Amino acid sequence: MPTDPNSNPVSKAGLTPSSINSNISEVQPTTGLNTINAAAGVKVKETENLRANFTAKSSLPAGSEITCTPQSSPLLSSTPPTVSKSLIKAYPYLIALNKILGVLTWTDDTSYISVLLVTTATLFILYFENFVIYLGHLSIVGLIFLYSIFRSYVEKEQKKSPTLDDVVHCLTTVSVRADMLLFPVSSLNLTSADLRRLLFTSIFLSPGYILVCYLLFPPKTLLLILVIFFLTYHSSWSRVTRKLLWRSSIVRAFCFYNTGLIFESGNNEKSSLFKTAMNKTNKKLKEVTRKAGGKHSGPVRFTYVLYENQRRWLGVGWTPNLLSYERTPWTDEFLNEAESPDNFELPQLNDDSGMYWRWIDKTWRLDLTNDGALQLPSSKYKTTADPKPDEGFIYYDNTWKNPSTEDSFSKYTRRRRWIRTAELVSPGDDSSTDSASLPHSASETVGLTLPKSTSISDVQSVNASGNITTSAETAPDSAGTAKKRKSLRFDATSTVYEEGVSDLKNVKETLEGGATDKKEE
């Protein structure tokens, strides 16, 4: 006898008594397969095994409801009870915070609340005095009323018994919206130098700000502009407007000169031209070391160069606080921004060769000759690790022109040169750091023909194309001219110092000729 489809709804999901939503009617025992129509329209074939899991008749009275216990999250078993209890109590507050962040970031289900907030803030600022005069005594009562509404809302949400999954989902949403709200500031990645530059620029432009407040924008109007800009920053039409305005070079220049900050993504990610040049240099030197290390692996050395830049301010003296549009306090030879000696780190090679950089000099040393611009007695050291405050500087005018070795009232800028030698070595290279010359096998492999007196420790700088410049500047000759600096290029073609080789050959021939004459005599 078939069962009544309206009296035997069976859930498809489970076969336990707790998963049944209604009573099961009495079924005649049969050996065949009978069909049971569930309440959801799902047909389940009844077998003896299926009927054996249930009693012939439910013990619950007719019309009673069975409460289904929700399935617990796997996080519940691994989360301490105290943490779970704290999260459940904080859940209503998280919902309120999520709602506020959604309104401020314009990511709520509807944007009408955000528009209403902007309108209310505008009216409050414009008619603040009237509001205080007529409704000031009611503001405290209004705040208490809002708190009571929020308290009832919290109690109502706590009675709903949220699951741990709901709390985790709400926490994730709050975290994402908080990051979105703070992204305009966090994306700048401001360093201490950037903050100092911003503070200095703001103080420098204070007279202009005061004039603007007195003549153009009263404090109430300026506050209204700032509040509207903040409340509508994340709206879609505001983002489109900023993108269109940012295409103008005038707007970008205005932002730069008023803040001293560079808002380009390249600067935010710290991918300056200096680091780009260093990456190219490391790649070149890595190839050279790999080729030179076939039979006799030796370290490749060169000297890092940093320039310290300062400006004179009337009443203050020489300070590293420069103008926002000029060079930074520390630069490389190409005026690219660089880290200070205290924060300078050797680059890391992200490859499988295992080679790494290490310092040869214990500390940064000041080049007292400033790359040969200053003449020193032969008895005096050319570098020092503990210089005096005004030692080793070259002085310039206000536009970094007309260099001079002497300070004067017409000089407002100056800079000096710091150097430190490093070497690129392989993990198994335990050779002494005193051997500074490049192995002969390396010269043959790379295609470099060097004089015997030339060593890698004389290398002074590396530019973005991988050119290494040496400091092999000889003393001035009788005519008062010095030989030009020579450069080593790590290219496919070999570089030959024809002048040096010819001089060595001439000296060698002269010595051999003199020895032959003495033997004949």
Swiss-Prot record:
Record: glycosylation sites: N23, N53, N189, N279, N463, N467
- Biased composition, class Polar residues, residue ranges: 429-446
GO BP: any one term: peroxisome organization
Gene ablation phenotype (knockout): Results in aberrant peroxisome formation. Reduces the number of lipid droplets and leads to fragmented and clustered mitochondria. Also results in retarded growth and reduced mitochondrial activities.
Superkingdom field: Eukaryota
Asked if the record carries the keyword Protease, the reply is: no
**Family matches, as SMART domains:** DysFC, DysFN
Q: Which Pfam families match?
A: Pex24p (PF06398)
> Where is the chain membrane-spanning?
111-128, 133-150, 198-217
InterPro entries, per this entry? Peroxin/Ferlin, Peroxisomal_PEX28-32, TECPR1-like_DysF
Per UniProt, what is the membrane topology?
A: Multi-pass membrane protein
Where is it found, in Gene Ontology cellular component terms? endoplasmic reticulum membrane; peroxisomal membrane
Q: Which family does it belong to?
A: Belongs to the PEX28-32 family. PEX32 subfamily.
Task: List, alphabetically, the PANTHER family matched.
Answer: PEROXISOMAL MEMBRANE PROTEIN PEX30-RELATED
Q: What does this protein do?
A: With PEX29, contributes to the formation of endoplasmic reticulum-mitochondria junctions which are important for mitochondrial function. Involved in lipid dropplets formation.
Protein name, per record:
Peroxisomal membrane protein PEX23
Q: Which organism is it from?
A: Ogataea parapolymorpha (strain ATCC 26012 / BCRC 20466 / JCM 22074 / NRRL Y-7560 / DL-1) (Yeast)
Q: Name the gene.
A: PEX23
